[in-house]
């Protein structure tokens, strides 16, 4: 494909235009009085959302150079979302402010490399101060963090706090759509473990990069599956039932994995493969625990069982299974409580009979996974559009509270970053030239989140920033008052603030040091014309491997 090239200031300015286009769409959502953004969908009704990462992913610009700038901001939002689960809009606002200041200085002749070094020194100093200010989570702080992260929704804050209280900070909490209008909390039998899908082609939700099945069947085995021949009978049976299938095995690879992927993507079979948790004998124990939870059998040579003899009665059943790239959550049906209780009692007896600290630790982990259960927040709303928006807010609140448990909390509303900015004066006094300017770029950008929160609340951003800087207090955008935000319960997770800043500086420093941008040259639109599907139709299972009537061999 032919390429387009852009050089020097022209290249950086085109990147900035693209970054500004996306950032301006995202920044209106920050704070408790942030606005919504309407996203047109290729099918169905539009989405009305308040989530920075979701908005960023939907934006693509016509100009190829500007679109690269937009993709860079998307990367900021995506990285922050992946690592912290929240703070995407804060990261976007910070990155935009730093890029604007940085490019203004490079255009005036500043050294991009020295600017970057100064910016890196500044962010290190801010992170150190942030860690000193951070306080551990206690009392009502969980509810307050969740409320702030969900845009001031008190009900969401209360529900997230209750869910964490019911299953502990380390417990499994999931969010699903409710059949009713009400949003409810339910604690049910379930389990989570650190193993993800064997192939990204199993993903069913591209936005969240997860595979999610309702009322799924589970094939549990401690064997490695490479040949699809072993799976033919059970796959034929499952396809006739119309239920999704998740295969938990030592490993699924080769012909077996390729065939599953192809037929899943053709819509012939809803299927996913996951590597079983743990190793060796502990893997067998983990699979046995999952079998008890789901009412299935572990297909094992130790029990003289083979895959080609599997029946529907041997398969486990789960109300819902959610699989990400590195974790799996199983929500069991309600009729597994007695079996789980008996299994937990059996493991406790085993615990009483061992003196090994390592074995005791692993047995306690198994008990916690089985007995802890899964808290399910069922989200209800009058319309599908409102339901999606509310679900995103609850997921943000959950992620923020988990981050708060990890690294503590600081005063929210953008006030902490603004107050820390004053401490950078000591750093600039020991520097000179463009490194000093790099520190000042970050220092000025630290006021951007508070300024935008104030403007979204209908206040003058510059006036609010000056008053907060001089008073030492914070701005409560919900009430319009200036007060101690820690006492008012306006809290941010330290981890979210830290990662938002670090990711913003990372991208901004790269843009400042950019000299050339290379983009794909847009191809002219193809002439209109007919033609059949180049795939040639589904025709049942893919010929890579067949399955009786479905074409598998």
Curated annotation (Swiss-Prot):
InterPro entries referenced in this protein's UniProt entry, alphabetically: Chaperonin_Cpn60_CS, Cpn60/GroEL, Cpn60/GroEL/TCP-1, GroEL-like_apical_dom_sf, GROEL-like_equatorial_sf, TCP-1-like_intermed_sf
Gene3D superfamilies per UniProt: GroEL, GroEL-like equatorial domain, TCP-1-like chaperonin intermediate domain
GO MF term list: ATP binding; ATP-dependent protein folding chaperone; isomerase activity; unfolded protein binding
Chief place of localization: cytoplasm
Region ranges (Disordered): 520-543
Catalytic activity field: ATP + H2O + a folded polypeptide = ADP + phosphate + an unfolded polypeptide
GO-annotated biological processes: protein refolding
Function: Together with its co-chaperonin GroES, plays an essential role in assisting protein folding. The GroEL-GroES system forms a nano-cage that allows encapsulation of the non-native substrate proteins and provides a physical environment optimized to promote and accelerate protein folding.
Name the record gives this protein: Chaperonin GroEL 1
Gene: groEL1
């Amino acid at each position: 494909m032919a390429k387009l090239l852009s050089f020097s200031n022209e290249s950086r300015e085109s990147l900035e235009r693209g970054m500004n286009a996306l950032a301006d769409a995202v920044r209106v959502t920050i704070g408790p009085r942030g606005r919504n953004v309407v996203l047109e969908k290729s099918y169905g009704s539009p989405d009305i959302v308040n989530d920075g990462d979701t908005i960023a992913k939907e934006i693509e610009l016509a100009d190829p150079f500007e679109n690269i700038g937009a993709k860079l901001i998307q990367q900021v939002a995506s990285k922050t979302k992946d690592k912290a689960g929240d703070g995407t809009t804060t990261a976007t606002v910070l990155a935009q402010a730093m890029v604007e200041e940085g490019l203004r200085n490079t255009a005036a002749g500043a050294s991009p490399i020295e600017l970057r070094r100064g910016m890196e020194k500044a962010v290190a100093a801010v992170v150190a101060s942030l860690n000193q200010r951070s306080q551990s989570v206690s009392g009502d702080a969980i509810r307050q963090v969740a409320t702030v992260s969900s845009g001031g929704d008190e009900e969401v804050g209360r529900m997230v706090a209750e869910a964490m209280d019911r299953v502990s900070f380390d417990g499994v909490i999931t969010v699903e759509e409710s059949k009713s209008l009400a949003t409810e909390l339910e604690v049910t039998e379930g389990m989570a473990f650190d193993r993800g899908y064997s192939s990204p082609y199993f993903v069913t939700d591209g936005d969240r990069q997860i595979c999610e099945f309702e009322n799924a069947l589970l094939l549990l085995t401690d064997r490695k599956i490479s040949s699809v021949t072993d799976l033919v009978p059970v796959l034929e049976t499952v396809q006739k039932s119309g239920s999704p299938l998740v295969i938990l095995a030592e490993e699924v690879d080769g012909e077996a994995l390729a065939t599953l992927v192809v037929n899943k993507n053709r819509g012939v079979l809803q299927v996913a493969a996951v590597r079983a948790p743990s190793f060796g004998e502990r893997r067998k124990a983990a699979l046995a625990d999952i079998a008890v939870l789901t009412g299935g059998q572990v297909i094992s040579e130790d029990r003289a069982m083979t895959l080609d003899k599997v029946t529907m009665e041997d398969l486990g059943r789960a109300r819902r299974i959610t699989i990400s790239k590195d974790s799996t959550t199983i929500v069991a049906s309600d009729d597994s409580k007695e079996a789980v209780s008996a299994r937990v009692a059996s493991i406790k007896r085993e615990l009483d009979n061992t003196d090994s600290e390592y074995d005791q630790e692993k047995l306690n982990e198994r008990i916690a996974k089985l007995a802890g259960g899964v808290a399910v927040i069922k989200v209800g709303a009058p319309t599908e559009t409102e339901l999606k928006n509310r679900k995103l807010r609850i997921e943000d609140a959950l992620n923020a509270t988990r981050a708060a448990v990890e690294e503590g909390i600081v005063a929210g509303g953008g006030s902490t970053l603004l107050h820390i900015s004053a401490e950078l004066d000591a750093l600039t006094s020991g520097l000179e030239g463009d490194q000093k300017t790099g520190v000042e770029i970050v220092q000025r950008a630290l006021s951007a989140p508070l300024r935008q929160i104030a403007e979204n609340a209908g206040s003058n951003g510059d006036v609010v920033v000056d008053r907060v800087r001089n008073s030492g207090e914070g701005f409560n955008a919900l009430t319009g008052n200036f007060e101690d935000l820690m006492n008012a319960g306006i809290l941010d997770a330290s981890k979210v603030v830290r990662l938002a800043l670090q990711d913003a500086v990372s991208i901004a420093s790269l843009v400042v040091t950019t000299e050339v941008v290379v983009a794909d040259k847009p191809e002219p639109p193809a002439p209109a014309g007919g033609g059949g599907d180049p795939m040639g139709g589904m025709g049942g299972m893919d010929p890579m491997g067949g399955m009786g009537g479905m074409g598998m061999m």
